[in-house]
């Protein structure tokens, strides 16, 4: 959430930045007008309360002197009524301000490229060269079925579209991948967490999913719980409402969890395969950092995600997302896209973001600066390290062989009992 004081004092600069994210200046002008009304009413109510205190003292004195205080009592009753009326107006204005400011996206960092959509993202670098096949390649969903390791038909029967069963060596490959990913992150100083897979509405608000993106989630009827769309939500909210000792920062968390997404608005997109599912595993990275080091931490986090792809020897590229394509809470985002041969393109497999103090303000996550003892908002960062199902898809396609088998990446073999190939049964 943005700082209302910052909007008030730097209105033109904030408006210019939010315009690059699709926010109209009219919205901010309305917010500014409401803020001015609120501040004026606060002055009025303070003046009235001061008058009420004077009237109260006059009544007390009149009673001590056994004089008639009926006029002062009437005056105080009128003051109380006026204060109550202003408080009601303030409550309405506060609600209007909240309804606007909670759905405003974060302002982009100065280094973020300005653009409207994914076409304006900027490629930063590439790693690895896409393999040149000398045979007709198969898509990962066809490979998965032929190898008897992925079963979409029964997933659809048991649950519905965009669900599947991993089976046999498919289940083992998925498990090997997330164990490998977690082990790599632990080497980089992350603390492993197993979080709740359901959170409350306050947690969803804290990380920015609520109120704007409720339609993208699965809420449990009759409860206040929501299935997590990403482990970012419980990991970040771990410190919601807390004040952390500044000496402990930065703090790194990593977790493997299922992620649940309704995929509202994705009808007709990626209807086959592992790219877009309602339920999938993802290894998440979350950081809590001081403002002065958060962008250094973003580069490290992105490198942590790249490390996984490099050790799996999967070609990828890194993009700096433009203002129009970044997520709601992000101030800056790098996307990692892995090469998917059957689609002859790169597809997103990780997104690493610095939200600066946007989530910290919503969730009231603060730290006590050891230098001056002051309590300040920290910066939160999050990134995929990686989306496991999409990594399975990339391995099946990039490591496929002409005979229909799939070579297991060397770094995963210790996690699969030394197995080197997944062969057709």
Swiss-Prot record:
GO terms for cellular component: cytoplasm. Its EC number is 6.1.1.11. GO terms for biological process: selenocysteine biosynthetic process; seryl-tRNA aminoacylation. InterPro entries: aa-tRNA-synt_IIb, aa-tRNA-synth_II, aa-tRNA-synth_II/BPL/LPL, Ser-tRNA-ligase_type_1, Ser-tRNA-synth_1_N, SerRS_1_N_sf, SerRS_core, tRNA-bd_arm. It catalyses: tRNA(Ser) + L-serine + ATP = L-seryl-tRNA(Ser) + AMP + diphosphate + H(+); tRNA(Sec) + L-serine + ATP = L-seryl-tRNA(Sec) + AMP + diphosphate + H(+). It is an enzyme of class 6 (ligase). Its main location: cytoplasm. Keywords: Aminoacyl-tRNA synthetase, ATP-binding, Cytoplasm, Ligase, Nucleotide-binding, Protein biosynthesis. One of its GO terms (molecular function) is catalytic activity, acting on a protein. It is found in: Cytoplasm. It comes from the Bacteria. Pathway: Aminoacyl-tRNA biosynthesis; selenocysteinyl-tRNA(Sec) biosynthesis; L-seryl-tRNA(Sec) from L-serine and tRNA(Sec): step 1/1. L-serine binds at residues 230-232, 284, 384. The keyword Nucleotidyltransferase does not apply. ATP binds at residues 261-263, 348-351. Catalyzes the attachment of serine to tRNA(Ser). Is also able to aminoacylate tRNA(Sec) with serine, to form the misacylated tRNA L-seryl-tRNA(Sec), which will be further converted into selenocysteinyl-tRNA(Sec). Homodimer. The tRNA molecule binds across the dimer. Belongs to the class-II aminoacyl-tRNA synthetase family. Type-1 seryl-tRNA synthetase subfamily. Consists of two distinct domains, a catalytic core and a N-terminal extension that is involved in tRNA binding. This is Serine--tRNA ligase. It comes from Streptococcus equi subsp. zooepidemicus (strain H70). The gene is serS.
């Amino acid at each position: 959430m943005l700082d209302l004081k910052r909007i008030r004092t730097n209105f033109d600069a904030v408006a210019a930045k939010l315009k690059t994210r699709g926010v109209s200046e009219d919205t901010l002008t309305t917010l500014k007008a409401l803020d001015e009304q609120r501040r004026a009413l606060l002055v009025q109510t303070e003046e009235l309360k001061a008058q009420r205190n004077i009237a109260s003292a006059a009544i007390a004195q009149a009673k001590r002197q056994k004089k008639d205080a009926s006029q002062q009592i009437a005056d105080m009753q009128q003051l109380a009524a006026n204060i109550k009326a202003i408080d009601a107006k303030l409550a309405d204005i506060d609600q209007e301000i909240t309804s606007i400011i909670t759905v405003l996206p974060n302002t982009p960092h100065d280094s973020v490229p300005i653009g409207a959509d994914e076409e304006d993202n900027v490629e930063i670098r590439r790693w690895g060269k896409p393999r040149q096949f000398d045979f007709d390649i198969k898509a990962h969903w066809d490979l998965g079925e032929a190898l008897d390791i992925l079963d979409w038909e029964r997933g659809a029967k048991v649950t519905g579209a965009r669900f599947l069963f991993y089976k046999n060596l498919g289940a083992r490959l998925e498990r090997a991948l997330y164990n490998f990913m977690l082990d790599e992150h632990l080497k980089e100083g992350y603390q492993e967490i197993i979080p709740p897979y359901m959170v409350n509405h306050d947690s969803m608000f804290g990380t920015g999913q609520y109120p704007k993106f409720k339609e993208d989630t699965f809420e449990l009827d009759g409860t206040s719980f929501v299935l997590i769309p990403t482990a970012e939500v419980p990991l970040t909210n771990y410190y919601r409402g807390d004040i952390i000792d500044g000496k402990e920062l930065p703090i790194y968390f990593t977790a493997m969890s299922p992620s649940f997404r309704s995929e509202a608005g994705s009808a007709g997109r990626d209807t086959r395969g592992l790219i877009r599912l309602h339920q999938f595993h993802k290894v998440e990275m979350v950081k809590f950092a001081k403002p002065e080091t958060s962008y250094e931490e973003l580069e490290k986090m992105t490198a942590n995600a790249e490390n996984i792809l490099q050790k799996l020897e999967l070609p990828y590229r890194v993009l700096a997302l433009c203002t129009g394509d970044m997520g709601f809470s992000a101030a800056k985002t790098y996307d990692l896209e892995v090469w998917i041969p059957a689609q002859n393109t790169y597809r997103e497999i990780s997104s690493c973001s610095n939200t600066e103090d946007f989530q910290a303000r919503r969730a009231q996550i603060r730290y006590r600066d050891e230098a001056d003892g002051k309590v300040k908002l920290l910066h939160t960062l999050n990134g995929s390290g990686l989306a496991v199902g999409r990594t399975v898809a990339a391995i099946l396609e990039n490591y496929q062989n002409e005979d229909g088998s799939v070579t297991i990446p060397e770094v995963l073999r210790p996690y699969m009992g030394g197995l080197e190939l997944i062969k057709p049964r």
